């Protein structure tokens, strides 16, 4: 994912900064404790598609 894109996109729920998790192909919002999938290189920034980090075994600490 382009680092410039990562600097301008934000969490759709809280508008917080997102962190890239390359290994699991997702963007993480540490404020809301949710992750958004990246599908074929495109971030899916829909709250309905987000996965709770509390329930996800791939959570990175």
Swiss-Prot record:
Matching entries from Gene3D superfamilies are given as: 2.20.25.10
Q: What's an example GO cellular component term for this entry?
A: cytosol
Q: Which residues cross the membrane?
A: none
Q: Which cysteines are joined by disulfide bonds?
A: none
InterPro entries, A to Z: Trm112-like
Q: Name one Pfam family in it.
A: Trm112p
Q: Which SUPFAM superfamilies match?
A: Trm112p-like
Highest taxon of source: Bacteria
Q: Which PANTHER family match?
A: PROTEIN PREY, MITOCHONDRIAL, ZGC:162634
Q: What family does the Swiss-Prot or TrEMBL record give for this protein?
A: Belongs to the UPF0434 family.
Q: What is this protein called?
A: UPF0434 protein MS0934
């Amino acid at each position: 994912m382009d680092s410039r894109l990562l600097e301008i996109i934000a969490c759709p729920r809280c508008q917080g900064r997102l962190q890239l998790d390359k290994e699991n192909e997702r963007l993480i919002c540490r404020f809301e404790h949710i992750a958004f999938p990246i599908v074929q290189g495109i971030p899916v920034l829909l709250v309905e598609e987000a996965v709770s980090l509390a329930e996800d075994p791939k959570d990175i600490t």
